[in-house]
């Protein structure tokens, strides 16, 4: 397939660096917005998103720290939509959260990427183990409760979620 080069500018989220971050966005064609699973959308996130919107910079939002105690993914998605006044489309969906976090589902192809826990906490993408979503339950890698929640969330997103629109994104 096609290969792409992504040049990332890692900017601080602290309010004291607002000017520098705003200036950095002038060099960007897109932005990756990180939302902490336990904190949700913070004030500085709203400000930076407003600058991206003003400059018509496409934004991908990523919820990180899913392997730590945090809020349910559907609640976070709702908060992102309301706080940023957007129609979010979930491209990936977490499999579990907190201590039950096991990986992600790529929704359009129903493929799973499983993660392994590290000895000091957190998760790492060691030898990427992928499989079809349909094979996840039989793999024994997630509990029946986690599998049921993932299936419930994915069904809800299929019925009531926003489809991904490249035109709207760009």
Residue ranges and their predicted role:
Residues 1-30, 37, 44, 49-58:
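Switch I (G2) and immediately adjacent beta-strands of P-loop GTPase domains
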Residues 7-8, 31, 63, 91:
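A near-ubiquitous, low-amplitude feature marking generic local secondary-structure context
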Residues 37-170:
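P-loop NTPase catalytic nucleotide-binding module
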């Amino acid at each position: 397939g096609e290969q792409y080069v992504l040049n990332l500018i890692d900017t601080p989220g602290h309010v004291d660096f607002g000017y520098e971050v705003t200036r950095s966005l002038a060099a960007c064609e897109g932005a990756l917005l990180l939302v902490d699973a336990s904190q949700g959308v913070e004030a500085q996130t709203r400000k930076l998103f407003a600058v991206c919107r003003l400059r018509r910079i496409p934004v991908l939002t990523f919820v990180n720290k899913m392997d730590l105690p945090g809020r349910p993914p559907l609640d976070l998605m709702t908060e992102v939509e309301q706080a940023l006044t957007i129609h979010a489309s979930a491209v990936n969906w977490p499999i579990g959260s907190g201590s039950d976090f096991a990986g992600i589902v790529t929704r359009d192809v129903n493929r799973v990427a499983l993660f392994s826990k590290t000895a000091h906490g957190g998760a790492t993408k060691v030898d990427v183990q992928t499989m079809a979503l349909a094979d996840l339950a039989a793999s024994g890698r997630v509990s029946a409760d986690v599998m049921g929640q993932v299936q419930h969330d994915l069904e809800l997103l299929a019925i009531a979620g926003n489809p991904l629109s490249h035109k709207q994104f760009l």
